[in-house]
């Protein structure tokens, strides 16, 4: 299997959790971008990856296969569009966008460019979701949540 080369947009706590988890995979963190060079440097140091000022500079960086978007949610759509246009796979923190129209536009662009688009949605393994699935499987007529 090909090793996935990652870039991370954002340097907050969720981006750090992703970078830590990435260390346990065969993926490689190539670069991280923040609004300031200093913030990117502080984040990148433990991972030995490149620190980039400006999110768009990371998106255009050659050699990156996939980008994890962990910026404020109002910027997700804009950054995801740029990534998909450059045929870079996108793993976007939730919510992927702030409305259904933007989400459908991303899905359409992803399909057009044959590029992966995925929301970082962890609720499939959440205990409440598993319990709900169990109850639905039992065909209970009334479910209270």
Task: Tell me the role of every PLM-derived stretch.
Residues 55-62:
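Short amphipathic alpha-helix with an adjacent loop that forms part of the alpha/beta core around
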Residues 49-55:
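Conserved SAM-binding strand-loop segment of SAM-dependent methyltransferases
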Residues 108-116, 130-141:
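Basic phosphate/pyrophosphate-binding loop/patch that engages nucleotide-derived ligands
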Residues 1-47:
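N-terminal Rossmann-like dinucleotide-binding module
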Residues 66, 72-73, 77-122:
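Beta-strand-loop-alpha-helix segment that lines the small-molecule cofactor/substrate pocket
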Residues 143-145:
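Conserved small/polar residues in nucleotide/adenosyl-binding loops
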Residues 29, 64-67, 140-141:
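Local beta-strand N-terminus motif with an aromatic residue
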């Amino acid at each position: 299997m090909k090793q996935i080369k990652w870039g991370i947009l954002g340097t907050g706590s969720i981006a750090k959790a992703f970078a830590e988890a990435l260390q346990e995979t065969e993926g490689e963190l190539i670069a991280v971008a923040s609004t300031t060079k200093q913030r990117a440097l502080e984040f990148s140091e433990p991972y030995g990856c490149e620190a980039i000022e400006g999110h768009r500079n990371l998106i255009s960086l050659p050699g990156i296969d996939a980008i994890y978007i962990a910026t404020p949610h109002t910027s997700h759509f804009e950054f995801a569009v740029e990534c998909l246009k450059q045929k870079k796979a996108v793993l976007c923190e939730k919510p992927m966008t702030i409305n259904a129209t933007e989400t459908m536009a991303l899905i359409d662009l992803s399909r057009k460019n044959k590029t992966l688009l995925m929301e970082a949605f962890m609720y499939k393994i959440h205990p409440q979701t598993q319990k709900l699935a169990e109850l639905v499987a039992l065909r209970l007529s009334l479910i209270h949540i």
